[in-house]
């Protein structure tokens, strides 16, 4: 991968020098890295949508970027020799060193909790899974937010690094590119090095945006992982290309800007929407005579063409905004079960799909949704504004000054800051209201960037209106003091992280194995052998289950262990459920714990439950498997041991062939006439997600004798949320019925109590040749009992 990244950077440098016409060598290098990386993501996505296999698509996209770079290298001499300014290099070196210290420390010191989705997504892309699905719900398509993972998978195709190491390389390289891009954006838009240094410093260390009573992010250096390196590489590259377009409207500049801007939608739709709207607004502003006088000939045409190209790329790329527009334009489309709505079940599914609903106006209006508890925070309230950095407070004055100076780049960044707060305060995003923290950080970052650009303009104005050196130096000192005060939070965070590193050196993880063990402590050589077997023998669209952490149903542990197994085996997992949310506030994960079927299977080893789960492989940790379940596995038809590790911890892989399982018995519908549930016993006094056997008393009236094997199962309805639980929380098995007229029979059923305390209704069903027949129901409640609370034993058989 490292060689591929270097070649990508060289190609990007050539394209910026020869096609965009950038002469400053460091500028061409940093913008080239960001543009080439972004171009690879966009091209790879478009090629895959033409149904080209993943590995072939990765080589084609990479080859196209290298080819464009080679063309640029051949044309570079036409714009003259490359220019290297020693002072710029020194300032960039100092800023890059500080950023590197924080970025690498944060990458090494601990795992990113958001990697629960990114690790397996990258792995599935490498397996060739496209279009992509949610790794935790293989039957659910995933909309949006995948560009970063797609690009990383494309580069990892060239080998030489694992997923975690690749993420570290990606974060460091792209953040360094953004250092250079922020610097040169400030220098070009703000008129000199004062703006360049101020903008870069504030963007990385002085944003200070968020909720003061929850979490405030100091800047890009603190959000070093997840999607952020790629998102802001796109963001600053687009702004720089916009600035270059204003200076010289070259076709290559307009095309590159349009491709990157349109592709941003599949990486981070929120940032695309805001940036695209701001650029469109400023393009309209150039039509105003007083503003348009400062625009070079041809800029309006080039800008319009670039924005039109961005819109087309957005529509065909499959990102969330493009999908919503296409769906809205398709008048023949009808609402489906996957369409987000106000029901609890659809709310749960929307989280797994990243499927966003948008309504206007938001109630209450002009409020932000707190990321922790979901409460409404008025946009202009002291509790919110008082928690933001100084850049947001200075934004109105900075915008007035930049408008007076006709600084179009500064106006764009200022509009991004304003829209990033107005949009989430005015529009309701349904399940994702709690995610408006992303908007808030973008607003704070854009405000910091705007103030940095404005500070350079102020300094240029002072320099042009006074000959006094002490006034100039006083202005520089004032700007430096303001930046330093805003960076204090970043350095406190750095010192705390450094204290953690020195106090707990075992948390400083560098190798790929150490990074995996940060999520899954027992991961070792036996796991590596088992995962390699699945990488070699697993196929696309096959699914996996594992019993990692079977003794600990904490959602975070189940999630982390599943993430590591999936990412190393490159197979999705069919073990989780769509959970109903009792409240709609804050940031909510779509993956919280095992489904009832998964818990019941690993407890009982029942082959009928396994059939309903439909995995293709079982990844078994024998030491956490009960003896009864281990024995049951060896007796299930269609389940065959395929691999056992020879080194390290014992790991066993089972192959599941559903076609080899015997047909499930069914009764005739007529034979169930007069059959009804008398009572369901054993539903009292248990805590959420606890397994037990319940007893169903079934009675029958009528002359027809009911006798034979049948599949009997239950479904649950959450009476508190007024919604059915997910199908994965329905459990059934095969039992033998033999009931005569007036008789009754007690059947035991595996049962897992629902995950939320509250009131429920259980309905009992029997499968027949003519469909499922409901034979009765019972209401019950689940209390939030503390772990270890004793509860009644199930009645004896």
Task: Give each language-model segment a name.
Residues 280-282, 296-315, 458-500:
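Signature aromatic-anchored transmembrane alpha helix within multi-pass, membrane-resident enzymes
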Residues 333-341, 403-407, 482-664:
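Extracytoplasmic
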Residues 1-84, 792-796:
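Membrane-embedded, hydrophobic transmembrane alpha-helices
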Residues 78-87, 247-252, 290-303, 397-419, ...:
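Membrane-interface helix-loop-helix junctions at transmembrane boundaries of multi-pass membrane enzymes
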Residues 253-268, 280:
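Membrane-interface alpha helices of multi-pass inner-membrane proteins
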Residues 1-11, 64-65, 94-97, 226-237, ...:
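Alpha-helical transmembrane segments at the extracellular/periplasmic loop-to-helix junctions
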Residues 86-234, 269-273, 506-523, 544-553:
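Active-site lumenal/periplasmic loops and adjacent helix-entry segments of GT-C-fold
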Residues 18, 234-253:
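Membrane-interface transmembrane helices that cradle and orient dolichyl/undecaprenyl
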């Amino acid at each position: 991968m490292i060689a591929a990244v270097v070649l990508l950077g060289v190609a990007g440098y050539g394209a910026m020098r020869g096609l965009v016409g950038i002469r400053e060598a460091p500028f061409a290098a940093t913008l080239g890295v960001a543009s080439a990386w972004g171009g690879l993501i966009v091209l790879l996505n478009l090629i895959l949508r033409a149904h080209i296999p993943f590995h072939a698509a990765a080589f084609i996209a990479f080859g196209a970027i290298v080819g464009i770079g080679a063309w640029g290298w051949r044309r570079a001499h036409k714009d003259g020799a490359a220019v290297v300014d020693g002072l710029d290099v020194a300032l960039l070196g100092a800023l890059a060193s500080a950023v590197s210290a924080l970025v690498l420390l944060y990458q090494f010191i601990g795992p990113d909790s958001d990697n629960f989705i990114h690790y397996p997504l990258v792995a599935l892309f490498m397996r060739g899974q496209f279009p992509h699905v949610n790794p935790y719900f293989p039957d659910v398509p995933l909309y949006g937010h995948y560009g970063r993972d797609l690009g990383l998978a494309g580069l990892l195709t060239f080998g030489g690094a694992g997923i975690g190491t690749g993420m570290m390389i990606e974060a460091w390289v792209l953040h360094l590119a953004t250092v250079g891009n922020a610097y040169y954006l400030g220098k070009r838009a703000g008129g000199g090095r004062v703006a360049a240094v101020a903008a870069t410093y504030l963007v990385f260390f002085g944003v200070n945006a968020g909720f003061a009573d929850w979490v405030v992010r100091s800047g890009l250096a603190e959000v070093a992982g997840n999607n952020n390196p790629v998102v802001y590489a796109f963001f600053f590259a687009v702004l720089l290309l916009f600035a270059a377009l204003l200076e010289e409207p070259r076709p290559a500049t307009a095309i590159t800007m349009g491709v990157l801007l349109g592709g941003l939608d599949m990486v981070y739709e929120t940032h695309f929407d805001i940036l695209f709207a701001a650029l469109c607004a400023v393009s309209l502003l150039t039509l105003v005579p007083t503003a348009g006088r400062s625009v070079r000939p041809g800029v309006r045409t080039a800008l319009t063409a670039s924005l039109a190209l961005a819109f087309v790329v957005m529509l065909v790329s499959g990102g969330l905004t493009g999908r919503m527009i296409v769906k809205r334009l398709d008048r023949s489309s009808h609402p489906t079960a996957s369409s987000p709505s106000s029901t609890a079940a659809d709310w749960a599914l929307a989280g797994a799909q990243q499927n966003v609903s948008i309504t206007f106006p938001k109630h209450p209006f002009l409020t932000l949704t707190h990321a922790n508890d979901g409460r409404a925070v008025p946009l202009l309230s002291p509790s919110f504004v008082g928690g933001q950095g100084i850049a947001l407070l200075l934004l109105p004055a900075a915008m007035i000054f930049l408008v007076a100076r006709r600084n179009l780049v500064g106006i764009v960044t200022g509009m991004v800051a304003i829209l990033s707060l107005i949009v989430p305060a005015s529009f309701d995003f349904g399940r994702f209201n709690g995610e408006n923290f992303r908007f808030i950080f973008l607003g704070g970052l854009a405000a910091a960037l705007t103030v940095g650009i404005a500070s350079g303009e102020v300094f240029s104005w002072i320099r042009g209106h006074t000959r006094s050196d002490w006034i100039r130096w006083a202005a520089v000192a004032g700007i430096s003091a303001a930046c330093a005060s805003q960076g204090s939070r970043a350095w406190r965070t750095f010192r705390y992280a450094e204290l953690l590193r020195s106090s707990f050196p075992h948390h400083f993880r560098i190798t790929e194995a150490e990074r995996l063990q940060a999520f899954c402590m027992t991961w070792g050589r036996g796991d590596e052998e088992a995962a390699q077997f699945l990488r070699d023998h697993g196929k696309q669209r096959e699914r996996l289950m594992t019993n990692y952490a079977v003794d600990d149903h904490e959602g975070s542990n189940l999630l982390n262990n599943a993430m590591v197994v999936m990412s190393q085996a490159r197979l999705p997992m069919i073990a989780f459920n769509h959970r109903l949310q009792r409240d709609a506030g804050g940031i909510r994960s779509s993956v919280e714990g095992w489904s009832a079927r998964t818990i019941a299977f690993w407890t009982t080893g029942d082959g009928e439950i396994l059939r309903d789960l439909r995995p293709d492989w079982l990844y078994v940790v024998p030491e956490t498997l009960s003896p009864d379940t281990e024995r049951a596995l060896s007796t299930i038809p269609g389940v065959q041991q395929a691999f056992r590790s020879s080194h390290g911890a014992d790991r066993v892989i089972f192959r599941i062939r559903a076609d080899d399982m015997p047909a499930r018995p069914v009764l005739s519908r007529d034979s169930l006439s007069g059959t009804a549930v008398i009572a369901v016993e054993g539903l009292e006094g248990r805590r959420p997600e606890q397994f037990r056997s319940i007893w169903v008393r079934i009675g029958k009236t009528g002359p027809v004798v009911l006798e034979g094997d049948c599949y009997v199962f239950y479904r649950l309805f959450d009476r508190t949320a007024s919604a059915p639980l997910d199908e994965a929380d329905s459990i059934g098995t095969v039992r033998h019925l033999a009931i005569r007229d007036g008789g009754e029979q007690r059947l035991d059923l595996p049962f897992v109590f629902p995950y939320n305390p509250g009131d429920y209704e259980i309905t009992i069903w029997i499968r027949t040749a003519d469909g499922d027949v409901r034979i009765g129901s019972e209401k019950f409640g689940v209390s939030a009992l503390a772990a270890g609370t004793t509860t009644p034993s199930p009645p004896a058989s």
